[in-house]
Every structure is written in C-alpha cells, then in structure tokens.
Amino acid sequence: YIESHLRPQWGWRSIFGIIGFILIYILIAIDLEIDFSQLLKDSYLYMKDVIGRMLPPDFTNFKNLMLSMLETVEIAMMGTLLAILLSIPVGLFSARNIAPNYPVYLVAKTITVFFRAIPEFIMAMILVIAIGFGAMPGIIALGLHTMGFLAKFYAEAIEHVSEDPIQALESMGASKWQVISFAVVPQIIPSFIGNNLYILDRNIRMATMLGIVGAGGIGYELQSAFRMFQYPRVSAIIIVIFITIFVIDMISSWIRSKVV
C-alpha cells in the first residue's frame, strides 16, 4: 500500500505535458539547425586542438596576474557592497506585506525588474563609453544589476516571514519602522547573509568577464592573451581564476555554515 501510495500518478495531463515539452525542444533544435552528431564530432576535434595549444600554461609575470585577479575580487566586493546598499530600501518597498502603498510597491518592483533585465556586460559597455575605462564601470554595472536580484531576494524573504510578531507589535501601537526592525529583520537575517554571499560569489565570476569590455581586472589580461593568440597564457589565467573562485567558494560555504 505504501509503495503504491508513493508511486507517482501519471495522468493524461502529465503525459501530454512531457510529450509537448519534448516536441518543443525538437522543434527548437530543427529551427536552429543543430546537428548533434556533427556537433559532437567537431567539438572533440576543435577542443583537442585548442587544448593542445594551451598546454603547458605560461605563468610568466605571475605577479601581474595575481594583481589583476586581486583587482577583479576588489571590483566584485565593491559592486556587491553597492548592490546591498541599494537593494535594502528597494527590497523593503517591493515586499507586498510592508510596502507603504501600491504605487510605491509598483515603482520598487519595476526598478528590480529593470536592472535584472539589463545584463551587467551590456551595462558595463555603456558605462565604459560614458565614464571611461577602469574599475568604476565594473563596480557600477555589477552593483546595479545584482541590486535587482538582491532586492527580489529580500522582498521574497520578507513576504514569507511569520505574521505573528508583526501583528503583535502592530496591536501594541508600534510604528512601521519598529515593526520592520523588531519583527521582520530578525527573521530575514539568515536569508540576508546567505543571499549576499551568493551574490558576492557570482559577482567575482562576472567581474572576470567585465574586464573584456575595459572594466578592469583579469578579464583585460584574458582578452589581451586571446587577441595575441597566447593560448598558454590563456590557460594560466583560467587556472588562476579557477583557484581564486574555488577558495572564495570554500570560504563562503564555511561562513554560511557558521552563520546561516
């Protein structure tokens, strides 16, 4: 009885849904003219050739690589700080249960959707044209784009808090900010820390790419190596990026396990 109860019940809707899902992807593959057999064959040959050119890695001027990687991490950290500072008020106002009124909620929600919709890569290109090369375009691009994500995460966390502490404080005549400070904030702190660490980890990965458009960091070194066909240098840069992100991911996981 237990096994039959736990066994998934496949109705006609589920079956037709799965068939429809498969057909959609078959049609997409046909429309994009994807030949999987040729793709696998060509990918193997091309990857074998590229990997052969990239070995052994060229770690000359290792100090410059590490300084560029440090700049990338600094850009990501400053971009994350900017995102946190901007997303706190936007996240509060885009939460249905504590927004002052619907127009304020709608404006805040629109802001989060707008900045999520513009990739940081495109935003960095626009900012490089507007204010020039360097770290600042990367910081602003990461801050604005990830502000949209953080504000969304904050709002969702706020909307799922327990209503009992909120109602208790409101019944005692507490102000809106007192309710937020003493009933909402304590409940969302674990989510707040976890989301911030996730965004920092993500921003470090994205900051490596923003240098390609002139926003500073190791991405510029990567672009230069590709442009000069210095594939051993490219593999060295990729290794440095991988080790850095791996170490930071381990640190983030440790912090998350201790705090969240």
Q: Model features per residue range: what roles?
A:
Residues F133-I199, M250:
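Membrane-cytosol interface at the C-terminal ends of specific transmembrane alpha-helices
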Residues V90-A124, F153:
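Cytoplasmic-entry segments and transmembrane alpha-helices of multi-pass inner-membrane transporters
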Residues Y1-L81, I88, F93:
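N-terminal, non-cleaved signal-anchor transmembrane helix
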Residues F21-L23, M77, L81, L85, ...:
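Generic alpha-helical transmembrane segments of integral inner-membrane proteins
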Residues V113-T146:
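Generic hydrophobic transmembrane alpha-helix motif, especially the helices
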Residues M66-E74, A108-F115, D201, Q223:
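Alpha-helical membrane-interface segments at transmembrane helix boundaries
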Residues G194, S235-V260:
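C-terminal transmembrane helix and the adjacent membrane-cytosol boundary/short C-terminal tail
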Residues I129, M206-I241, V260:
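Glycine-rich helix-loop "coupling/hinge" segments at transmembrane-helix boundaries
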